[in-house]
Amino acid sequence: MSDLARAFDHGKAFIVFLTCGDPDLETTAAAVRAAAQNGADLIELGIPFSDPTAEGPVIQTANLRALQSGVTTDKIFDLVRELRRGVTIPMVFMTYANVVFSYGTERFLSNCRDVGIDGLILPDVPYEEKEEFLPACRRYGVDFVSLIAPTSENRIAMIAREAEGFLYIVSSLGVTGERSEIKTDLASIVSLVRENTDIPCAIGFGISTPEQAKKMADLSDGAIVGSAIVKLLAQYGKDAPEHIGAYVKEMKDALR
């Protein structure tokens, strides 16, 4: 079993997304620790990019704040190395192909292994292009996490059959961000995924309330929340980790 799959060993998983370096790396570290201590099962660390096409305005702005704070990929690797002295839950990077290419794919994934990153999510890399990254991911023991958006049954089945770690099911087409309601027929997507793989699946994009998180986790194996947490960072800055801890506890309690 991959380390990522272990995040789903203790019931429904609550997965937290944070943009590294927003507002600074010290706050990111404190926020990750607060999330882990309050029940987060897996952390997605966003490596900021100047053109984050999958993101809505909340996370786009977080990317800009992080880049303006002087964050670099090397500094983020140092951050993870430091976090791994105490944080034991799985962690994945979520970023864009250009970030990996410009750093050097082999070097990037070798460093992922060395610092303790368990998986990689690249939302701008479609299924057909994942071979550009998959061999290096496998060489260094880093799961390449696939996203499934509302699409044809054949495509969902094809992606599910080759999935690694866990599957990230996108609740609705479009960019990340909170939504008042989610109308996609997610039950059918999850059912199709489960017919084709034993790998756990979690739903993200648009989840912000305990009620939404419970509904999504009841359908799948977990819920992923990003924009609502990034909003806390925008609102409270360096004081956000305390608020993030309380929010994570409330959300995780809703999944128990």
Residue ranges with predicted function:
Residues 19-24, 94-102, 126-127, 147-151, ...:
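Glycine-rich beta-to-alpha transition loops that act as phosphate-gripper elements at the mouths
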Residues 47, 60-122, 255:
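Active-site beta->alpha loop and helix N-cap motifs at the rims of alpha/beta catalytic domains
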Residues 76, 191-202, 208-256:
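Alpha/beta catalytic cores of nucleotide-metabolism and tRNA/nucleoside-modifying enzymes
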Residues 14-18, 43-45, 91-95, 120-122, ...:
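Hydrophobic faces of well-ordered beta-strands that scaffold small-molecule active sites
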Residues 25-35, 151-161, 203, 207-223:
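Catalytic cores of alpha/beta
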Residues 1-7, 50-59, 71-81, 101-107, ...:
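Active-site-adjacent beta->alpha loops and helix N-cap segments on the catalytic face
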Residues 1-18, 81-85, 256:
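N-terminal amphipathic alpha-helix/helix-capping segment at the start of soluble metabolic enzymes
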Residues 41-51, 117-121, 126-129, 171-177, ...:
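Glycine-rich phosphate-binding active-site loops on the catalytic face of alpha/beta enzymes
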